Amino acid sequence: MEETFQLLYDTYHQDLYQFLFYMVKDKNQTEDLLQEVYIRVLNSYHTFEGRSSEKTWLLSIARHVAIDWFRKQQTIRQRILGTFDWDTQDVRDQQLLPDELAVQHENVREIYAALDQCTIDQRAVIILRFIQGYSIQETAKALRFSESKVKTTQHRGLKVLRKHMELLREELMDDEVRMERRTDKGVVKSTSGS
């Protein structure tokens, strides 16, 4: 079993890491979730029947681990919202984006923000299809969806992404117009003052 596990690790670790990282967008959390994936693999490898590829099986486990984590986060968030007195406390988000997400290209940041607007299934399909380059058939096998569900989920996810990207671009254009107006006013003041 040790040799088999090592082979699985060597062969698929990077794919699993990328999949989970794009889901949770945090290096430390990704590593924690990977540990959970590997524990589940060790505990259930004897039940693997080979009806799908090992990669498909591993990605399915990773997806379930991510879903469990998101559910747990939602429960924690609801508990906090229910017990915290928001009217009397100064609340600020102290959490910064991980270094891995401080990507230079603005479009990549916009896509990350837009992915947060998608459901877990939409996010998983988009990550597998467009970031990891899976075909519709491979995505269906990995997520244990029908091909039509992959297509529908992909279509809906892309629609959410497109809408969110348009909103972000509108905000950026509004900001640029405001900056131009301020700059124009500053130029007028400095030239009229001489």
UniProtKB/Swiss-Prot annotation:
**Where in this protein would one find the motif Polymerase core binding, according to its record?**
32-45
Entry keyword DNA-binding: yes
What SUPFAM superfamilies is this protein classified in?
A: Sigma2 domain of RNA polymerase sigma factors, Sigma3 and sigma4 domains of RNA polymerase sigma factors
A Gene Ontology cellular component where this protein is annotated is: plasma membrane
* InterPro entries linked to this entry: RNA_pol_sigma-70-like (IPR039425), RNA_pol_sigma-70_dom (IPR014284), RNA_pol_sigma70_ECF_CS (IPR000838), RNA_pol_sigma70_r2 (IPR007627), RNA_pol_sigma70_r4_t2 (IPR013249), RNA_pol_sigma_r2 (IPR013325), RNA_pol_sigma_r3/r4-like (IPR013324), WH-like_DNA-bd_sf (IPR036388)
UniProt keywords (A-Z) are: Cell membrane, DNA-binding, Membrane, Sigma factor, Transcription, Transcription regulation
Q: What induces it?
A: Induced 3-fold by the beta-lactam antibiotic cefuroxime.
Gene3D superfamilies membership: 1.10.1740.10, Winged helix-like DNA-binding domain superfamily/Winged helix DNA-binding domain
| Residues annotated to bind DNA | 136-155
Disrupted gene: phenotype observed: No effect on antibiotic resistance; double sigM-sigX mutants have 130-fold increases sensitivity to the beta-lactam antibiotic cefuroxime. Association with RNAP core increases during many stresses (at protein level).
Q: Where in the cell is it found?
A: Cell membrane
Q: Does the keyword DNA-binding apply?
A: yes
Q: What is the topology of this protein in the membrane according to its UniProt annotation? A: Peripheral membrane protein
Q: What does this protein do?
A: Sigma factors are initiation factors that promote the attachment of RNA polymerase (RNAP) to specific initiation sites and are then released. May be involved in the regulation of iron metabolism. Associates with RNAP core during early growth phases, association decreases as cells age.
Which protein family is named in the record? Belongs to the sigma-70 factor family. ECF subfamily.
Subunit info? Interacts transiently with the RNAP core.
PANTHER family, A to Z: RNA POLYMERASE ECF-TYPE SIGMA FACTO (PTHR43133), RNA POLYMERASE SIGMA FACTOR SIGV (PTHR43133:SF60)
The protein's name: ECF RNA polymerase sigma factor SigX
Origin species, per record, is: Bacillus subtilis (strain 168)
Recite the lineage of the species.
Bacteria, Bacillati, Bacillota, Bacilli, Bacillales
Q: Which gene encodes it?
A: sigX
